[in-house]
């Protein structure tokens, strides 16, 4: 029996000469895989709806393994994210993080909405790195590794100067900071943003402007925290790091990351 779902294509691989196997992150069932027969043919009605990042309604026959994709109706191709090198790199990281962090057929409508909203904001021209930071912060609860952000992770203090400790999985106050010689000193702006990004309702996100120095602090904290606790090996992360180095020497030209 074919069933209708709302989904985002988070992975697509070629299978044989004309077919694809697509991984869809659906609102209704979570992550599912489906065979798209003939989708590699440019003339196929499944060609556009099986492109990475495509968002639409799909009719599939589910199974315990790989199901069958019968048809799809495109809502948003997210084309702008595929055609810009920098946007494509950030979007690829977002969807791979989602893919590697979730189990097959485990429903999570909150995560679906988070992924959709993040990609839409990116396609609208929001700061790619800021949107990635927000997504990474929110994924920590999905992964079951939330940091302590509302108090000192050791003594519970809520006032004073704070740094971030990967070892203690959260903030350390100035009285406890000696517990981790490898802690990250943070500016007040970085502390506020880590808390904001973790708790913010994305549907109410306004304009956020962040200095490059603050971005560097956030980048270092999140990268180290994920390396320590997430246990994920992401190809897109390595590519994103290379893109970050390229950003230092080239102007992307569209103002996305300024």
Curated annotation (Swiss-Prot):
Q: Pfam family of this protein, just one?
A: RecO_C
Top-level taxonomic group:
Bacteria
What UniProt keywords apply to this chain's record, in alphabetical order?
A: DNA damage, DNA recombination, DNA repair
Quote a single Gene Ontology cellular component term.
bacterial nucleoid
Write down the InterPro entries for this protein, in alphabetical order: ARFGAP/RecO, DNA_rep/recomb_RecO_N, NA-bd_OB-fold, RecO, RecO_C
Q: Biological process (GO) annotations?
A: DNA recombination; double-strand break repair
List, alphabetically, the SUPFAM superfamilies matched.
ArfGap/RecO-like zinc finger, Nucleic acid-binding proteins
UniProt keyword annotation of Hydrolase present = no
Q: PANTHER family of this UniProt entry?
A: DNA REPAIR PROTEIN RECO
Q: Which family is annotated?
A: Belongs to the RecO family.
Q: What does this protein do?
A: Involved in DNA repair and RecF pathway recombination.
* Name of the molecule in the record: DNA repair protein RecO
Species for this entry: Geobacillus thermodenitrificans (strain NG80-2)
Q: What is the lineage of its organism?
A: Bacteria, Bacillati, Bacillota, Bacilli, Bacillales
